[in-house]
Amino acid sequence: MSSDPTGRPIETRKLRHLEACLRPESQYQKVKTGLDSVPWPYRALPESNLEEMRLDTVFLGRRLKAPVLIGAMTGGAEKAGVINRNLATAARNLGLGMMLGSQRVMLEHPDAWESFNVREVAPEILLIGNLGAAQFMLGYGAEQARRAVDEVMADALAIHLNPLQEALQRGGDTRWQGVTYRLKQVARELDFPVIIKEVGHGLDAATLRALADGPFAAYDVAGAGGTSWARVEQLVAHGQVHSPDLCELGVPTAQALRQARKTLPGAQLIASGGIRSGLDAARALSLGAEVVAVARPLLEPALDSSEAAEAWLRNFIQELRVALFVGGYRDVREVRGG
């Protein structure tokens, strides 16, 4: 992919991000999600039928066939467009939702729009746009948020929080004072759902408390233990990780979910960050998530084809179904306690 330069710094960086994410060094090396330590029941007499297990879920007012979103990954270059269309096709076929990668490049370079245009292949999926919190401290406002949603015909917008990534990025945006007020201000001007998400270092309790009185529809905890975007940035900049201790910072996914459910008991939560199997998903749902989001494990299949991405997701969903079945559940709602 590095042999396909775009001539634009942002787009070139997006391609390098993809390359870096495929490297094992992009993953947390010491910190784990904590999901392995979440107890899961095993029932030798489950008293249910596997094939009748109900997984359908309503999220942001849309019905999904399973509580699964394709997480935010990429956009802004030709290769990214292929990935996004393959993922959207898989989401369409399976009745899932999808988050786009950061659309800043699309707003600043309109010809990058095509790489985010997935409605041609998936006209009816739940589609979530994406902009960075830092951009709202640098002149972005409700107008740019509306463009990010309207120009790709999305249903909602995720605003991603990535201070550690920005701090370790060459030329990163690190002026964040006043950002909490600014995000609430912008969200109040919008007439579509706004989601707050981390990028893989976790939403902490203090941040959730600070956002609690804002008009946010959901929170993606994006916990530590999967892809470290701090590591990704250092791999892009230096070819290796120069600050390994800093790159291990974050709130592990299981801890982030527990804190979020305690801090915002009525909020809709997305669990992401190191979700690698259907059992991970089941455990995350048991901690209070409404849906889970998966990104990194889908990157290689999506580079191959929509069929490969769909096959990975089918297996993931079947793992979730089996976990619920042997756990004694008959419906995904039961695992959440509702």
From Swiss-Prot:
User: What residues bind FMN, as annotated?
Assistant: A72, M73, T74, S102, N130, K197, T227, G274, I275, R276, A295, R296
What InterPro entries does the entry give?
Aldolase_TIM, FMN-dep_DH, IPdP_isomerase
Report the EC code(s) recorded for this entry: 5.3.3.2
The protein's superkingdom reads: Bacteria
Binding sites annotated in the UniProt record for substrate? R13, K14, S102, Q103, R104, Q165
Q: Which GO terms describe its biological process?
A: isoprenoid biosynthetic process
Q: Which cofactor does it need?
A: FMN; NADPH; Mg(2+)
Q: Does the keyword tRNA processing apply?
A: no
What Pfam families does the record point to? Answer: FMN_dh (PF01070)
Question: Which residues participate in Mg(2+) binding?
Answer: E166
Q: What class of enzyme is it?
A: isomerase
Q: Which GO terms describe its cellular component?
A: cytoplasm
Localization: Cytoplasm
Q: Which reaction does it catalyse?
A: isopentenyl diphosphate = dimethylallyl diphosphate
Q: Which GO terms describe its molecular function?
A: FMN binding; isopentenyl-diphosphate delta-isomerase activity; magnesium ion binding; NADPH binding; oxidoreductase activity
Give the UniProt keywords, A-Z. Cytoplasm, Flavoprotein, FMN, Isomerase, Isoprene biosynthesis, Magnesium, Metal-binding, NADP
Q: Which Gene3D superfamilies match?
A: Aldolase class I (3.20.20.70)
> Quaternary structure?
Homooctamer. Dimer of tetramers.
Q: What does this protein do?
A: Involved in the biosynthesis of isoprenoids. Catalyzes the 1,3-allylic rearrangement of the homoallylic substrate isopentenyl (IPP) to its allylic isomer, dimethylallyl diphosphate (DMAPP).
Tell me the protein's name: Isopentenyl-diphosphate delta-isomerase
Organism, per UniProt? Deinococcus radiodurans (strain ATCC 13939 / DSM 20539 / JCM 16871 / CCUG 27074 / LMG 4051 / NBRC 15346 / NCIMB 9279 / VKM B-1422 / R1)
